[in-house]
């Protein structure tokens, strides 16, 4: 599909002959000892130096013929990420299982609510990236939750991105998916929560503070009414608990303000790192781009 591209295959401790077959076909094979897709993505962006990155899983489920179209969209529209959203023919229920489809829709919706964006397939493993995206991506995840991190990185830095529908096929006979619907879904959900805390700390701690403040008010109102009527505070432990809850609410809000300032500074640093690299269109106009890899 991309005859001018350099092909890199990252072998994540596979037990078959994938690495040997890829090497015989002319691909550059890199062994990644640390298990997990996130570890592979981290190594890929660190080791490969390219102007355009096409990332796909090695299970033959994604349409390789769509790669030129995705690359063209990236270059023509001067984007930093193009996601190949999965569309199956519906003839085989195992192609895109209902549980995976529902989980993807739920998690994609959660990210859209928390971080914005209009993606419909956040968990797609078929993506095209610009050089400045790849070199500014911190890649902290270890497993399948890396797709969530890839998406949120683009949304947080307000990078231009797009989504293109691509065919999604059944895995080859004898091939078994390593994705666990519940285990990996739970890990992805935890990643979304962690990213919400780290990227939206003021909102997170404000929610916690508001809940604590409401609890404090609910506890103190009856105590205060009794005091107004009798001049006594018969439920002293309740009054102490209400005071502690209000102090915790104020402390939570202050923590949110401090963490938000730290997050903005970190985001500015990533943005400057991102802007230090020319865009795809600029590299093409200067004759720097040498084709996707």
Q: For each predicted feature, which ranges?
A:
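Hydrophobic helical membrane-anchoring modules
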Residues: 140-293
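Acidic metal-phosphate-binding loop of nucleotide-sugar-dependent transferases
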Residues: 60-62
């Amino acid at each position: 599909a991309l005859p001018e591209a350099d092909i890199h295959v990252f072998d994540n401790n596979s037990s078959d002959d994938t690495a040997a077959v890829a090497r015989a076909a002319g691909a550059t094979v890199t062994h990644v000892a640390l298990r997990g897709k996130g570890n592979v993505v981290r190594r890929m962006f660190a080791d490969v130096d390219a102007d355009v990155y096409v990332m796909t899983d090695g299970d033959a489920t994604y349409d390789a013929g769509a790669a030129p179209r995705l690359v063209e969209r990236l270059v023509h529209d001067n984007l930093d990420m193009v996601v190949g959203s999965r569309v199956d023919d519906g003839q085989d229920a195992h192609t895109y299982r209902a549980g995976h489809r529902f989980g993807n829709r739920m998690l994609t919706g959660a990210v859209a609510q928390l971080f914005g964006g209009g993606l419909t397939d956040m968990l797609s493993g078929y993506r095209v990236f610009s050089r400045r995206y790849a070199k500014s991506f911190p890649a902290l995840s270890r497993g399948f939750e890396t797709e969530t991190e890839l998406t949120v990185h683009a949304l947080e830095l307000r990078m231009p991105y797009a989504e293109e529908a691509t065919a999604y096929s059944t895995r080859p006979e004898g091939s078994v998916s390593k994705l666990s619907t519940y285990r990996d879904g739970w890990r992805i959900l935890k990643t979304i929560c962690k990213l919400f805390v780290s990227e939206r700390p003021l909102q997170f701690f404000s929610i916690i503070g508001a809940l604590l403040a409401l609890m404090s008010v609910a506890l103190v109102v009856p105590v205060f009414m009794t005091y107004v009527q009798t001049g006594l505070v018969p439920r002293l432990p309740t009054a102490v608990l209400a005071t502690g809850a209000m102090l915790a609410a104020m402390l939570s809000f202050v923590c949110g303000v401090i963490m938000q300032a730290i997050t903005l500074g970190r985001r500015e640093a990533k943005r400057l790192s991102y802007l230090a690299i020319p865009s795809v269109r600029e590299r093409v106009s200067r004759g720097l781009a040498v084709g996707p890899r």
